[in-house]
Amino acid sequence: MKKLIVLFVSVMFILTGCKNDLIGEKSNIKIGDNDVEFTLVKDSFTNTKASCILKNKSDKILYYGTPWDIEIYDDGSWKKMNVEMMFNMPLMGLEPGSEKVLNFNWEHTHGKLKGKYRIIKDVYFENEEKFFIACEFEV
């Protein structure tokens, strides 16, 4: 019985430590641009996936790719997560006034999440600097 308790405590310690290892340094990403909305599709998220609507409210084509990241709200600030992901690099364009549903699945990279998070994407308009958009959710 004593060995079983030690094993259980060890496993719990390892699992707790793994979650903390995912939390990285404080994020320096600034979210901006009123001409773009990035919102959660109602009832679309679980602890392993979510869908967000990317809406271009400008009069220019909005460009974006497949890369994305997740940040966690921890101890009063947004923090990066220590997870590396690989992406194909196609470039997509979203016409003015259009919207697109983007689906995200992090089960194999981040596991099952619990807490407050945001999905981060970088986007840009032609001949302009890239900027970041965020879709927040809590599980």
Per-region residue spans from a language model:
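Generic low-complexity, intrinsically disordered sequence content enriched
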Residues: 5-11, 26, 44, 117
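Short, solvent-exposed, Trp/other aromatic-anchored flexible loops in extracytoplasmic proteins
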Residues: 83-116, 122-126
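Primarily secretory-pathway and cell-envelope proteins
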Residues: 18-85, 123-139
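Hydrophobic alpha-helical segments, principally membrane-spanning helices and signal/leader peptides
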Residues: 1-2, 36, 41, 100
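Sec-dependent N-terminal signal peptides of Gram-positive bacterial secreted proteins and lipoproteins
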Residues: 1-22
